[in-house]
């Protein structure tokens, strides 16, 4: 993301490197290590903005999907990603993505890793979209989606700015009450701030982690069809466990003992 972007508020500037690309390019790209592989759980959350086509499930979607995630059929690293059996990106290869997806957000396309090519990387810690999302969440909890209580924007107006920036084709949020609008804000945070180190902490503060983080992790199995198309089958690739105690970190034993046990350990530890 450009340092000169008017949306950037706080950014950590890194030097020229290719570590992000090395760690996250598809395994079939020379030098790539297939590190972060997004889940199908996340991909399914991106809204449709056109006709639903099961044979082409990544078309007509919220454009933030294409901007953030490499899907089967994407043009990436100068070629078309094909994860079907026997293809260059065959998912059966060692260290290939188990979910059928690769990270795209933050990466520079088509760096020649074998020649040591590098790019500037900046980590944006805080940006304007987060302010709008924080504002929308707080205003909704305080006054509901459509009462600005004398402030500049309503919760709905702030949320719509974020969505319009992504695509003017995204439909307006129609949630009419506080509870439904809360879910709309949470959805928008999941999409807009994907891979920016917010989702886990959001789930903790919303007390949703027990439900969400105990769901199976899903991916897709890609198969070639007659002609030049593919078929996609949702498959379970992993199980996760989140315990009630994981909402809190434990105090170290030494801290508890040094307090003469006046410091009580968090529940479950």
What are the roles of these predicted feature ranges?
Residues 1-27, 52-269:
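Acidic/polar-rich alpha-helix caps and helix-coil junctions
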Residues 39-50:
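Conserved alpha/beta catalytic core and glycan-binding cleft of carbohydrate-active enzymes
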């Amino acid at each position: 993301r450009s340092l000169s972007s008017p949306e950037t508020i706080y950014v950590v500037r890194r030097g020229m490197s290719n570590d992000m690309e090395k760690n996250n390019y598809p395994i079939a790209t020379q030098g790539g290590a297939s590190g972060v592989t997004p889940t199908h759980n996340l991909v399914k959350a991106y809204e449709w903005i056109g006709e639903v086509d099961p044979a082409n499930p990544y078309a007509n979607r919220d454009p933030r999907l294409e901007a953030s995630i490499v899907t089967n059929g994407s043009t990436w690293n100068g070629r078309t990603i094909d994860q079907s059996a026997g293809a260059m990106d065959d998912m059966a290869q060692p260290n290939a993505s188990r979910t059928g997806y690769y990270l795209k957000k933050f990466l520079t396309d088509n760096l020649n890793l074998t020649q040591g090519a590098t790019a500037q990387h900046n980590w944006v810690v805080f940006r304007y979209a987060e302010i709008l999302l924080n504002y929308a969440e707080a205003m909704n909890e305080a006054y509901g989606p459509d009462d600005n209580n004398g402030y500049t924007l309503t919760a709905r107006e702030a949320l719509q700015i974020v969505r319009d920036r992504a695509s003017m084709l995204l439909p307006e949020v129609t949630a009419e009450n506080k509870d439904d609008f809360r879910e709309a804000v949470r959805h928008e945070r999941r999409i807009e701030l994907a891979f920016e180190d917010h989702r886990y902490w959001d789930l903790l503060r919303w007390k949703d982690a027990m439900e969400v983080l105990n769901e199976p992790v899903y991916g897709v199995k890609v198969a070639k069809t007659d002609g030049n198309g593919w078929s996609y089958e949702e498959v379970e690739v992993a199980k996760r466990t989140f315990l009630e105690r994981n909402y809190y970190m434990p105090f170290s034993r030494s801290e508890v003992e040094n307090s003469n046990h006046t410091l009580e350990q968090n529940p479950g530890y």
